[in-house]
Swiss-Prot record:
Pathway annotation from the record: Amino-acid biosynthesis; L-methionine biosynthesis via de novo pathway
Protein name, UniProt field: Methionine synthase
EC number(s) stated in the UniProt entry for this protein: 2.1.1.-
Described purpose of this protein according to its UniProt entry: Catalyzes the transfer of a methyl group to L-homocysteine resulting in methionine formation. The physiological methyl donor is unknown.
Necessary cofactors: Zn(2+)
Cofactor binding notes: Binds 1 zinc ion per subunit.
GO molecular function, one term: 5-methyltetrahydropteroyltriglutamate-homocysteine S-methyltransferase activity
Length: 332
């Protein structure tokens, strides 16, 4: 990793696919373009996403996860033991290809290494983050038709994810984020769910981040310091920063990834609004341990709005950096 400024800015993972990529996917499904043409479109989209992140001033970018349709489906298609029967309705007219576990979970081959290697080759910084869905969330968002209980399923998934993470490190990944948005949704599972995440990162030599959002933080707060990760990033903006008091109460002592951008609202935050929110966060945590990020992935927004939100996030962060510099902090 290269040296980062105080209050590093990053993204959670996903970013809107360019319109032309969505059209290429449609044409491929219709049999009108080749597999090779589609892969070229995906690669071009990664370059476009990284260009957006660069232009916005993001310190730690991702490839936007543009090659992945969905955060669980992608991995279920590539890990042995899953089967798809068809889509299920999530809400309204939104459908999800919910996978079913029908046999023992086994790791087959690298799933993200090629994706990461290409992004690394075109990235403007070696501080490139790669994301992977965690074992608990994959299990929670799947049907279990094989294992006697969910815990056994989750721990077998943790072993598979651990192998993938180690392959990413071997390929040169330095910052790896485990996405666990479901981990804090069932109080009765949290203690062993945390153990499963630790199993997934066991023996890994990289900067490890975990992302959680939109659940009940009070379920997981007592266990956060037990996680064998360097940083945990949270959705804060949508909760008006109320979880900060909870984290302080439980003595949270890891790096804090602070969500300051609402990803479910098309309103573009101003840079001063972001700066004010960061000032709130610094009332609870020292700047040396704080990173700045959106609440969650940006893929559901238009590309234009997602980009403008990132610009506001970065500009607001710069305002606070300058204030800290005047107080004697080293910010570069």
């Amino acid at each position: 990793m290269s040296k980062l400024p105080l209050l590093p800015t990053t993204v959670i993972g996903s970013y809107p696919r360019p319109k032309w990529l969505r059209e290429s996917i449609r044409l491929h499904k219709a049999g009108k373009i080749s597999d090779e043409d589609l892969q070229e479109a995906f690669s071009d989209a990664v370059i476009a996403v990284l260009k957006d992140h660069y232009n916005a001033g993001v310190d730690v970018p991702t490839d936007g996860e543009v090659r992945r349709d969905e955060m669980v489906e992608f991995f279920a298609e590539r890990i042995k033991g899953f089967k798809f029967y068809g889509p299920v309705r999530v809400w309204g007219t939104a459908y999800y290809r919910k996978p079913s576990v029908v046999s023992k979970i086994e790791y087959k081959k690298p799933m993200l290494v090629d994706e990461f290697t290409f992004a690394k080759s075109v990235s403007y910084t070696d501080n490139l983050k790669i994301t992977i869905t965690g074992p608990y969330t994959i299990a929670e968002w799947s049907y279990n038709e094989y294992y006697k209980n969910k815990k056994d399923l989750v721990f077998d998934l943790a072993k598979a994810i651990n192998q993938e993470i180690k392959n990413l490190v071997e390929a040169g990944a330095k910052i790896i984020q485990i996405d666990e948005p479901a981990l804090h949704t069932r109080r009765e599972d949290v203690s062993w769910g945390v153990e499963a995440v630790n199993e997934a990162v066991k023996g890994v030599n990289a900067k490890l981040v975990m992302h959680i959002c939109y659940g009940e933080y009070s379920f997981v707060a007592p266990y956060l310091n037990e996680l064998k990760v360097d940083q945990i990033n949270f959705a804060f903006k949508i909760y008006n920063y109320k979880p900060l008091e909870l984290l302080k109460r439980y003595g949270f002592d890891k790096e804090l990834g602070a969500g300051v951008i609402d990803v479910h609202n098309r309103r573009i935050e101003t840079s001063e609004e972001v700066a004010n929110d960061i000032r709130k966060i610094l009332e609870y945590f020292t700047p040396e341990k704080v990173w700045i990020n959106p609440d969650c992935g940006l893929k559901l927004l238009s590309r234009k709005i997602a980009y403008q939100k990132l610009v506001s996030m970065v500009e607001g962060t710069k305002v606070v950096r300058e204030e800290l510099k005047r107080k004697g902090y080293s910010v570069d």
